[in-house]
Amino acid sequence: MMLAVEDVLSELAGEERNERGLPPGFRFHPTDEELITFYLASKIFHGGLSGIHISEVDLNRCEPWELPEMAKMGEREWYFYSLRDRKYPTGLRTNRATTAGYWKATGKDKEVFSGGGGQLVGMKKTLVFYKGRAPRGLKTKWVMHEYRLENDHSHRHTCKEEWVICRVFNKTGDRKNVGLIHNQISYLHNHSLSTTHHHHHEALPLLIEPSNKTLTNFPSLLYDDPHQNYNNNNFLHGSSGHNIDELKALINPVVSQLNGIIFPSGNNNNDEDDFDFNLGVKTEQSSNGNEIDVRDYLENPLFQEASYGLLGFSSSPGPLHMLLDSPCPLGFQL
């Protein structure tokens, strides 16, 4: 055990002890085997250990939430010596009741071996504290591991009120799950900031589904620069009608639905002028010959509710002029 050596070294160095009797930085986290073969055995056969302060408590007279203040060892887990209180003078059943509730055993007792699977040295019992009285007690987060000697070690101690050593702790939350959720939230937050700052055009669903054929016919679509203007007149009017129809066929149906909302008169033809709206032309001719400003329609609250629903938003993310001034997927601009 290195604790005694560290005690001597810390005293020679003049280190200040903490309130638990350990040098700064030391924590009391013994294994199941160490609790039984060293601490419990020393208590039973030698009355305890010099310099190791583990409190003796009567677990039937103390509620679990009172135990941390009584402990001399442990921070998140608290350790105690206790005498098993027999329920009946001639019986072997243990009294587990307190004033506010009772300890109830859960699962089977676990065998504790020495040397990684060697000799059986003791048993470990897990108990959970319930408020109230059985069988209608209310389960709490307080858990106790009770360790006792077994086999040859237990036969050496003939006293019926045998000593046990207990580890008590409160399961007030699964730290692994909390950590996972925190990491997920941090990832989503950082990913959102990165996407908004560097790839703002990815905030909307893709309106173009590229294919190998399209990328061959239109090399400019290979570039993913949101500030590059791909809807110039040279591109539109210098291309054949076949190529334009091929490009129009790749437009997501969302665009067609938006056009249907803005121009319900069915003024959609299969010519190049009709295709101009999808590529950024902001005016259109109505059925009576008057020029229509597309922004008037886009700023209409009824249109905003309908169009954002088609784009997958539950509600409008902000003023529409911000969306109009922002880069759209693959260079398209509304």
Curated annotation (Swiss-Prot):
Chief subcellular location equals nucleus
Every copy of the NAC domain together lies at 22-171
Q: Give the consequence of mutating P30S.
A: In cuc3-102; cup-shaped cotyledon and abnormal SAM
Q: Which tissues is this protein detected in according to the database?
A: In a general manner, present at the boundaries between mersitems and araising primordia.
What does the UniProt record report as the effect of altering G25D in this chain?
A: In cuc3-104; cup-shaped cotyledon and abnormal SAM
In the record, biological process GO terms are: meristem initiation; organ boundary specification between lateral organs and the meristem
The domain of life is Eukaryota
Please list the residue ranges the record marks as binding DNA. Answer: 121-177
Entry GO terms, CC: nucleus
What keywords sit in the KW lines? Developmental protein, DNA-binding, Nucleus, Transcription, Transcription regulation
Give the Gene Ontology MF terms in alphabetical order. Answer: DNA-binding transcription factor activity; transcription cis-regulatory region binding
Q: Where in the cell is it found?
A: Nucleus
Q: Does the keyword Acyltransferase apply?
A: no
Which Pfam families does the entry link to? Answer: NAM
Induction behaviour: By BRM, at the chromatin level, and conferring a very specific spatial expression pattern.
What is the documented function of this protein? Transcription activator. Involved in molecular mechanisms regulating shoot apical meristem (SAM) formation during embryogenesis and organ separation. Required for axillary meristem initiation and separation of the meristem from the main stem. May act as an inhibitor of cell division.
Q: What is known of its domains?
A: The NAC domain includes a DNA-binding domain and a dimerization domain, and confers the specificity of the transactivated target genes.
In its UniProt entry, what is this protein called?
A: Protein CUP-SHAPED COTYLEDON 3
Source organism (scientific name): Arabidopsis thaliana (Mouse-ear cress)
